[in-house]
Amino acid sequence: TMALHLLPEPKDLMLVKGMCALDQEMSIVLPAASGDASWFAARELRKEVLRATGMALPIVKEQAPPRPDHAILLVCGPEQAEAFALDPSHKRLDAAGEQREQAYVLAVQRGRIVLYADTPAGLFYAVQTLRQLVRLHRDHIPALIIRDWPSLEARGLLLDISRRKVPTMDTLKHLIDELSHYKLNVLQLYTEHTFAFPSHPRIGAGCGSLGSEDILELDAYCRQRHVELMPNLQSFGHARNILRLPEYRHLAETGLRWTLSPAVEDTYTLLGDLYGDMLPFFSSPTLNVDCDETYDLGQGASSAMVDELGGVGQVYMQHVLRVRELAARHGKRIQIWGDMLLNHPELIAGVPGDVMLLAWSYDPAESHPGVGELSGVGAGLWVCPGTGSWNSLFPRISGARVNIRNMVREGMAAGAVGMLNTDWGDFGHYQHMGLSWHGYILGAAQGWTGGTTSDEAFDAAFGPLFFGEEHPAIMEALDLLAHTNDLPGVQGINRSNTVLALFDDPLVGETVEGDEALPAETLREMHSLASQAAATCEALSPEHQRELTLREMASAADMIAHAALKTALGQRIRATLRKVAPGEPPSELDEQILALDKLAAGLEGLREEWELLWHARARISEIHVALGFFASTHTRLRIAAAWLEEQRRALAAGESADAELETYNASDHRVLWQIWPD
């Protein structure tokens, strides 16, 4: 039997003998009564056939049952099925209840293909599956019958657009095209400040904010592809981008300027204004108000409320109820993250019946107890795993595989209705977006199948479908890069020390000396894996259909290799200084000074390519944050070289070297998570 690698894997696929040859006689046939959605899906299919075979199939509408062969029928709903006299087996959707809404049948026979669904969304998904068959088999499609439906009704992606990087409109549309092709049906853009609020223009100024017309355009683009663009506006903690502005400082709970204080009535005036500026542009009935990680709640302005209401949890819940009211004025129900409820479990039972709970964890654990604890209350539970791309130069794929699969499985067991895969941008969003395609599509696949897709089956399908030509070599490079995160000493919680090694101080950084220092063997292996991957991606990227993604992989690989060299050099310099005696400075010191200068020049080249790749997908936004890491690291390399030159001179003059680096000052060099919280 031939293995058919489709993503997501269909629930029920039966191969039959023979195949369907696509030829010039073929047309795409719609019932006369079909609407815009069928016409859109038909054009998507035609584009795919044209790309794969060079044939442009006509799209026609017919009143009566069409001829039995040379036709691809797109049929939506029982009335159209009757008009086209469909065989009963071709309209048998085995799905029940809510899942029927997105179910479809795809029957490929000799000379004829039938796509049937009850709804436009189901028909759109049938077309996506057929597009994959065309991509893989071109003009000879294997005969089969597929009956398919999703395990989870809502399958979404949350993309962080507030940690200093806002994608261009073209990038967002490309993202929506890709996500909807793999049957994702929800998109949230995580927003702290990156929206142009007419009533508070300074909040979103100068950071690449999306405007209201951008939202109208994206909302329509999403609806056409059966994606719900859900508004997302952080409404409690994570408010530093607002609270740093002088005119809003009085709203802060504490001097940390992190949480909007529920003790200040102006907090609710502000949120009411922001909701009024933003929510009317979204057709979705649901707003994610976030409200996670309110670290300092109850420790400042609201401390009296804590005594009055009987605990921080009660203060938290009262705020949630107030934002729920504000959202309701705009006809929206709310979603909230569940972490604060898990910290105050006594609140869970009192969650109102129209509030959706989001259980998040990015941990590659076998079980996530929060999923069960948050189930059975409110308006339904969504599970929220992550792509593992943030706090890392390349995504922590092996962790993301386990995290996504297990969160979805536990969600299914707990009766969850949705999955929201997350792609965060902590500390400057320096990781390239294209590195997350694997994680985005993995989330879509597991959400559809209920977490039953194996890693091997996923990769076997993802390579050919996403990368196309040269996919075996590209997937091998992807594995090599993923493996750099699994080497001894590299993993932290939700982060990877490859990126710390890149931006750390070259002589006293955490990855160079001390408990967090990376072992020499790890650094050698890191350099070897990354160099091999870089060579593959650089060789294959020109003219490839995924050229940009391959350049992003090469850039990440080059940065990982550079980080390994830099850290190993720092460790060698420290070792040299410990063993030199006054008198003749060893020649290796000269080599090490030159090597630091060479690394500084190399870092400039890496930054240049990194910056080009940022602009290829994103607005300028707040690129200065990540550029600051490159600039200060470059400065540290120069300072280290100059300081080492002083040690060389001291040795030549018969003095001792400063083996303990007491005269080397790096205390003001703080990068990444050393600048917590973000």
Residue ranges of model-derived segments:
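N-terminal small/glycine-rich loop or linker at the start of catalytic domains
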Residues: L144-S162, L251, W382-N391
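A structural preference for short, hydrophobic beta-strand core positions in alpha/beta folds
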Residues: I59-K61, P231, I336, V383
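Solvent-exposed loop/turn segments at secondary-structure junctions
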Residues: S34, E79-Q80, P120-G122, R164-K165, ...
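Substrate-binding groove of N-acetylhexosamine-processing glycoside hydrolases
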Residues: M2-E25, V29-A32, W39-A42, P66-P68, ...
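Contiguous, structured surface segment used for ligand recognition
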Residues: M2-R155, N406, A413, G418, ...
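A generic structural signal for short coil/turn motifs at secondary-structure boundaries
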Residues: D36-S38, L115, V166-P167, G298, ...
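Aromatic/His-enriched, Gly/Pro-containing loop or helix-boundary segments
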Residues: R92-L106, H200, G206-I215, I397-S398
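Substrate-binding cleft of carbohydrate-active enzyme catalytic domains
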Residues: L152-G338, A349-G350, M356-L358, S367, ...
